[in-house]
Amino acid sequence: MAKAKFERNKPHCNIGTIGHVDHGKTSLTAAITKILAETGGATFTAYDQIDKAPEEKARGITISTAHVEYETSNRHYAHVDCPGHADYVKNMITGAAQMDGAILVVSAADGPMPQTREHILLARQVGVPALVVFMNKCDMVDDPELLDLVELEVRELLSSYDFPGDDIPIVRGSALCALEDKQPEIGRDAILKLMAEVDAYIPQPERPKDKPFLMPIEDVFSISGRGTVVTGRVERGVVKVGEEVEIVGIKNTVKTTCTGVEMFRKLLDQGEAGDNIGALLRGTKREDVERGQVLAAPGSITPHTDFEAEAYILNKEEGGRHTPFFTNYRPQFYFRTTDVTGVVALPEGTEMVMPGDNVKMIVTLIAPIAMDQGLRFAIREGGRTVGAGVVAKIIK
């Protein structure tokens, strides 16, 4: 039988493996590529190739991440796997590898461990929409009651972090058996069952173009006789000529109308996600708009000053701070295109934050910024990046 051609006409989804060290995340990643390669949906990538993941820089932070791609009959997947725990923390917080869903790997022999908990919490804080669980190393457990116990424990843990623990699919298997062609019911078959659950349970992400319009403003020009033009790259959605838009953030929200869209000096009927455009705004004065504000579909986003964040603080080797910081630390928070000063309050029980730590914190900005949950930011001191974070919850 000829192999099916690798086509890009299927819906695309970004996923990753998360879970405690040595529970088998990388083995599972290798096993998925091996089993799907049988039907031409992947190229087998061995454990060693995934494990020596190259280092990448995202927002000035060094992260090691392995990327593999594969497809099922329903979808095309880009899958990320990180060698070390710190890489996961950085990856999830910076959004370097955006995850539409994740496979939580738990060893049946050990049950949930500290990093299992931490990765679930991070997934919740950074807004990973859905998880599927792979209970790995089932070949090492003889007692089926023990497997039931571990499953119960995992479900309770998921529920305690506001994931639907009762509904999340948990697939039992062994990545090693799949890689070594042993015990197909927990090897090959379990991998196929896992991928069927991922296909069915992880929702298809909305394409950026289908979301409400938003464009971070990078520059503002005044064109005599025409009005004010704002430029930027459309982050999501579509803006059509003649539509009403809002200017949000820093100052009071103002409504205006987009009377023209220009790209590469050509006039267009609309600008959409990914386009670098200039938008002509009716009746808006040059001094009423500034970099750092956003142009958005009316009512789709609101400005806020107070939020709870999950942040990673760079260590000395990454070019970060050399000393810890405490409550009332006042750095700049860089959102999209601009820096805003903010004050940090640390949670009770956290006295200080050391370089290299990840931390939950409450931030109060001196000016409101257009934000929603999941927005990424950099923490800077005089233009130098000292951390990265994500808005976990808006307070006001």
From Swiss-Prot:
Start and end residues of each stretch annotated as G4: 136-139
Entry EC number(s): 3.6.5.3
Record GO terms (molecular function): GTP binding; GTPase activity; guanosine tetraphosphate binding; translation elongation factor activity
Keyword tRNA processing in annotation: no
Annotated catalysed reactions: GTP + H2O = GDP + phosphate + H(+)
Residues the record lists as binding Mg(2+): T26
GO cellular component entries: cytosol
Highest taxon of the lineage: Bacteria
Region (G5): 174-176
Domain tr-type G: 10-206
UniProt keywords, alphabetically: Cytoplasm, Elongation factor, GTP-binding, Hydrolase, Magnesium, Metal-binding, Nucleotide-binding, Protein biosynthesis
Cross-referenced HAMAP family: EF_Tu_B
Family from the record: Belongs to the TRAFAC class translation factor GTPase superfamily. Classic translation factor GTPase family. EF-Tu/EF-1A subfamily.
Protein name from the UniProt record: Elongation factor Tu
Organism: Paramagnetospirillum magneticum (strain ATCC 700264 / AMB-1) (Magnetospirillum magneticum)
Lineage: Bacteria, Pseudomonadati, Pseudomonadota, Alphaproteobacteria, Rhodospirillales
